Amino acid sequence: MNIIWHGHSCFEITGKDGTIVFDPYQANSVPGLNSLKLKANLVLCSHEHDDHNARNCVEVAPKDFKVTCIETYHDHHQGSHRGKNTIHIVDFEDLKVVHMGDIGCMMDDVSKLKNCDVLMIPIGGYYTIDTKEALKYIERIKPRIVIPMHYRSHEFGYDVLSTNEEFIQQSSSVTYVDDCLEVNKDTKKQTVVYKKPRN
């Protein structure tokens, strides 16, 4: 399985099972990122904000996948500030992939997320959980591969978001890749930081 990062919270996973796109962003919704034009068999959007719901930017050839959805909140106030958020758990090539979307709360029960192969988790704060909260989730979920998302870089992102620097400093076994990560059953436990988005 290959995991391509298109910036912000948008990932494309591809393999023999097909292609799934998570949280594509609308044109001009994320400063510094160009509009998307992708192809997939399934598009999964965690919520309906423009930086996560650009289904119109993905040409879809439908195919069935095993997907589990967990409803959570986009804030610490049971959704009263920013609404609901959906966590997607995908069974892809016998790997358990979890995309946390724009989660902004701490869940009491993470049993369905535990021991996943890949965890994509926001770290930028303000709109979502921050680095401190993300690290608490990671400790509880115990994923094999952690991919931080929804943060600010020098080239793109919202000014109110934190960068990934604090997260990197507090993470172990950090690996840097360009814009694509190959994952299989033998991939070692690590935190993966993409050097740049494919955009």
Tell where the protein language model's regions lie, with residue ranges.
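Proline-aspartate-enriched helix->loop->beta-strand connector
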Residues: 40, 118, 134-151
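Core dinuclear metal-dependent hydrolase active-site scaffold
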Residues: 1-42, 49-118, 126-133, 176-199
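Accessory terminal helices/loops
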Residues: 144-145, 149-199
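Short secondary-structure boundary segments
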Residues: 47, 123, 149-151
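Charged helix-capping and loop-helix junction motifs
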Residues: 82-83, 130-139, 160-164
